[in-house]
Amino acid sequence: MTDQKPIRARSWLFTPATRPERFAKAAAAGADVAILDLEDAVAAKDKAQARTAALGYLADNPSDGALHALRINGLDTRAGISDLEALLGSSAVPDFLVLPKTETIGHLQILDRLLTSAGKGTRLIGLIESAHGLAAAEAIATARK
């Protein structure tokens, strides 16, 4: 995985991706990172609309004064695969991609290869939400991207 210089980010502000009118406000709120959330904050029926809004904002506002993260749905879900396909096919380049339910370093390695091949220097954050993920926590936490 790609080695990058660490970024100090102490505060993270989650914004539902169904609320595009809040994206710029979140970026200006003073948090170190504004997270556009496609996962828990979005009902299943609204996933496609939220995906379009989040990727459009990230493509049109690459440097509005804040770091941006995109939390996608888990890769074991249809919505997660759709999130990833849409990101890879867009001009959006979030500073961070947040992967929920990360259970192995392999999840991050696959994402790294896909993002790198698409020319996106996006950093990865694997969220540990299960006992299986906890067992692999050291490997996940030491992933280089």
What do these predicted regions represent?
Residues D3-K145:
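Conserved alpha/beta-domain cores
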